[in-house]
Amino acid sequence: MPTLNQLIRHGREEKRRTDRTRASDQCPQKQGVRPRVPTRTPKKPNSAPRKIAKVRLANRHDIFPHIPGEGHNSQEHSMVLIRGGRVKDSPGVKSHCIRGVKDLLGIPDRRRGRSKYGAEKPKSI
């Protein structure tokens, strides 16, 4: 514990907060190219492989966003749009790919929660 004299001479150093959105430059969405197509296994109680993408953003940051929904058409060197939002059981995955934008297609024949997965409105009978 510092003495009063030491505090007068030096003061207290403020804690620096870590920036969780460093890769996105405080932007709501960011565009990137996908150089690799890996999958990851989640943390302990869960076991299904999670579909993720290694994406190089326009500002040269490499991030690992999650691809939501069942199945995807994403390949190497396809353009994707990234938004925030982490995946709780996958360490290091702090963003999501946006379906139905750029080269990542939406989910066909999806009826509910369509806006989250880039699905078109079904034709009424």
Swiss-Prot record:
PROSITE patterns to which the protein is assigned, alphabetical: RIBOSOMAL_S12
GO biological process terms held by the UniProt record: translation
Keyword ATP-binding: no
Region (Disordered): 1-51
SUPFAM superfamilies membership: Nucleic acid-binding proteins
Top-level taxon of origin: Eukaryota
Subcellular location: Mitochondrion
Keywords (A to Z) from UniProt: Mitochondrion, Ribonucleoprotein, Ribosomal protein
GO-annotated cellular components: mitochondrion; small ribosomal subunit
Claim: Mitochondrion is one of the keywords in the record: yes
GO molecular function (one): structural constituent of ribosome
Biased composition (Basic and acidic residues): 10-23
Cited Pfam families: Ribosom_S12_S23
InterPro entries for the chain: NA-bd_OB-fold, Ribosomal_uS12, Ribosomal_uS12_bac
Function: Protein S12 is involved in the translation initiation step.
Record PANTHER family: 30S RIBOSOMAL PROTEIN S12 FAMILY MEMBER (PTHR11652)
Recorded family membership: Belongs to the universal ribosomal protein uS12 family.
Protein name according to UniProt: Small ribosomal subunit protein uS12m
Gene from which the chain derives: RPS12
